[in-house]
């Protein structure tokens, strides 16, 4: 095999959005269906961030017949003035990597899922067409980008007399990048329903013009309803437990329930409305706090004697269904990778461990009549003793 030459001329510098098109997997994980939907999540998450900031209470997602998608919210709208670079601010956001208002506490968001500032630009880079429409400050701004952002149309700005504000983004994934450009209605419904569960009162509507279907999601009781939807039809030891509070700048919500028949554990966690499918420091802290609370209580009530070893965490969590929903300020937020599947914030471990240990322990002491059967079941199971039937 002939040797290939390697000289100075072989060194390439990929600038701007060209780098995203060259290596899309670095930004969205893959170019299959999962990566395709990741584009939609990037735009939806920007609208979710407006809701997290208390600036939006409605999000509309529309899948068009040509498999383009439109996401609209009634938030503040992306700023439309001139950026210090001399370009329109929306153009900077959609055509420049690492541009946005989510890098520090002085920006427009105290809490958000958009940590890296590449989401909107990545969507532009991997789409054949992107259209941006913004209503803000008595103006309506419109701009169109084509061919992965390589063609930038001049913006149009007109006076707007209405009271409605917000951002509307339409994009069409580039078939030259993706192995499929067909959005899956069921995947989108599941994700939007999750988001509505996580922000009490937020209304999210999904219209799919391909099928002529429309779905609306809104939940006044938040993750309690989320938990109930996951445990519906199952026998359990107790009603759903719900705890909320703040530790180390981190806002925490936990809903949990122990089933009397289920095996294994089902823990679903979210950080700033991002589903952390691979877990992270918050789940580690949750498990540690739960294990400590159970063992402390078991010894206090003498379910465990001095000679007995502690219950193992895996035994305690058997039959557990839990929803963990936390919000972390941008100043300490750390995800492992652009796809944000795993939390890396160190403070989350200690925050969740102390919070869960305290709240679960508090609940045990003051409402123990609801959980005594759980402890009896766990201890008997660990000792391989015969189980009494539980309802």
Feature annotation, model-predicted:
Residues 2-9, 67-89, 100-229:
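GHKL-type ATPase core
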Residues 153, 186, 193-195, 201, ...:
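GHKL/Histidine-kinase-like ATPase module
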Residues 313-379, 383:
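Extended, well-ordered alpha-helical scaffold/bundle regions in very large, multi-domain proteins
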